[in-house]
């Protein structure tokens, strides 16, 4: 996980970010991406939100995390986790050492021109690349709270339009240079009830939100009764290691 923002927010990040739906890990397990005796490299493991599930399902996990405070939290993720304090771009990885490489809400920080060939080398023939993330918001579901969020964002000097970075990297970007072959993309829509305080804590973990904006989101949730239902998405891209780059 890149950026000093997350390092400063390590404990808050661990407490505030909602978990990934079970169906994400069930899908990975069913495909043979994770599970007993499967050696997995996790990119940008952060506080271990996904790492704990990988370990719980029997995977042998090596976790990359450059932030010291976040890495310290990773040591509590369970037996079998080796933590490497490094970005993917800087990591020293042996060739053909992993069955799978995974990234949970982390791949958008990676320089793909460096990262994808490095992942390709680190994977065994036929190995998996699984990239997923939670998208905070669902454009198909408009709520009073989400309208307030849009109003907060619209006040920025350079207002953001669409979801942009939330959706990246796309399957096309991951497969563009021929290092990996697309298998499928899966998307799950889900909802979670959050108190105003939880909204404030969550939004303060977003690197593109200021403290004042997060406070405004918390106040909006408070104005709307003190609890809101947030509609989110989880998007998973599954790819296989190509025999050779094109």
Segment roles from a protein language model:
Residues 91-101:
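A short acidic, Gly/Pro-enriched loop at the edge of an enzyme's catalytic core
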Residues 109-119:
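A short, conserved alpha-helix within the catalytic core of class I
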Residues 43:
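Conserved beta-strand/loop positions that form the S-adenosyl-L-methionine
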Residues 168-246:
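Conserved Class I S-adenosyl-L-methionine
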Residues 120-190:
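Conserved catalytic/acceptor-binding region of the Class I
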Residues 105:
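Short catalytic micro-motifs in class I SAM-dependent methyltransferases
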Residues 39, 47-91:
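Class I SAM-dependent methyltransferase SAM/SAH-binding core
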